[in-house]
């Protein structure tokens, strides 16, 4: 039985025994919600998400492209793959580099 995580995101149809899953475990989500593309899923239960955004350069009054990479926990019930567009939510620190968890994954068109 999946629990409501407080976001407007439906629970995945699969069940998992992961304690770090926000739907089937005890991990609570709060804070930032980010959207990005999975660029690596080689680590165990971890994905690397790349976000692209525009940053204003005040001197020239123009925007420049920037990107950042974020590590996130990938629960077995979601299992995002490289190229998927994912929504990640902030949670308590899971490891040295992981403070986010994947809550939704979509295959791009």
Swiss-Prot record:
Matching entries from Gene3D superfamilies are given as: 2.40.50.1000
Write down the SUPFAM superfamilies for this protein, in alphabetical order: Nucleic acid-binding proteins (SSF50249)
Q: Which GO terms describe its molecular function?
A: rRNA binding; structural constituent of ribosome
Fetch the InterPro entries from UniProt: NA-bd_OB-fold, Ribosomal_uS17, Ribosomal_uS17_arc/euk, Ribosomal_uS17_archaeal
Family membership noted in the UniProt record: Belongs to the universal ribosomal protein uS17 family.
What role is this protein assigned?
One of the primary rRNA binding proteins, it binds specifically to the 5'-end of 16S ribosomal RNA.
Matches recorded under PANTHER family: 40S RIBOSOMAL PROTEIN S11 FAMILY MEMBER, 40S RIBOSOMAL PROTEIN S11-RELATED
Q: In its UniProt entry, what is this protein called? A: Small ribosomal subunit protein uS17
**What organism does the record attribute this protein to?**
Methanosarcina barkeri (strain Fusaro / DSM 804)
């Amino acid at each position: 039985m999946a629990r409501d995580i407080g976001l407007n995101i439906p629970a995945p149809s699969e069940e998992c025994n992961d304690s770090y899953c926000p739907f089937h475990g005890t991990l609570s989500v709060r804070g930032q919600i980010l959207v990005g593309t999975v660029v690596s899923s080689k680590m165990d239960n971890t994905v690397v998400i790349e976000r692209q955004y525009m940053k204003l350069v005040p001197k020239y009054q123009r925007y420049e492209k920037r990107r950042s990479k974020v590590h996130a926990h990938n629960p077995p019930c979601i299992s995002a793959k490289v190229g998927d567009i994912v929504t990640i939510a902030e949670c308590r620190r899971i490891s040295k580099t992981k403070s986010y968890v994947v809550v939704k994954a979509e295959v791009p068109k």
